[in-house]
Amino acid sequence: MRSEVVGAQLGEEAISSSLKAAAIGLVIVMIFMIVQYLVPGVVAAFALAIYTTLVIATLYLFEITLTLPGIAGIILSIGMAVDANVIIFARIREEIADGKSVATAIETGFARARSAILDGNITTLIAAAVLGLRGSGTVKGFASTLAIGIILSMFTCMVVTKVLMHAVYAIGVRDAKFYGKAKERKPFDFVGKTGIFIAISCAIIVCGCVGVG
C-alpha cells in the first residue's frame, strides 16, 4: 500500500493550475467551433459560456468543494457538451445540403441529433451514478461534478443552443452560407487494407510487451 501527503499550498497550486488549463482549453475549443462552424460556432461559444456559468453556480449553490477529480469531471462534461453541439451542427449542415431551408434544417437537425445525444449522456450519467454510489471520496467528487455537468450540458445543448439558433435566424442571419457546408464523405477501404492494420496492431502489441517486460 502506498500513501502520499500533499501540503495545502501544493494542493491549491495544483487546483489553480488545473483551472487555468481548463479555461485555456475552453477558449481554444470556442475558437475552433467558431472557425469550423461559423454562425453555429458562435452560438456554441455562447452556449458553452452559459453552461460554464451554470456549473459554477450549481457548485456554489450546493457548496460542493472543488477538487482535482472534480475539475476532471467538469472538463469531461465540457467535452461531452462540445460533442453534442458538433452532432447537432453536422445534422443541420446535412439538412441544408439536402436543399432544405435554414429554418427547417435547424428544427430537423436538433430532432435528428436528440436520440444520439440522449443515449450518450444517459449512459455516462449511469456510470457516474455507479461511481458515486460505490466509489471512494475522490471518485465521488469526480462522479458528482460529472453528473452535474452532464445534466447541465444536455440542458444547454438541447434548449439554450436551440433557442439561440432560432434567435440568430430571427434577427436576419438566414443565408445558408453562414451555417457552413457539409463535407463530402469519401469512402475508405478498410477491408482492402486489412494487412496494413494487422501489421500496425502487431507492432503496437510487440512494443507494449517490450515496454512492460
Predicted regions and their residues:
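Interfacial segments of transmembrane alpha-helices in multi-pass membrane proteins
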Residues: E12-T67, L133-G137, G192
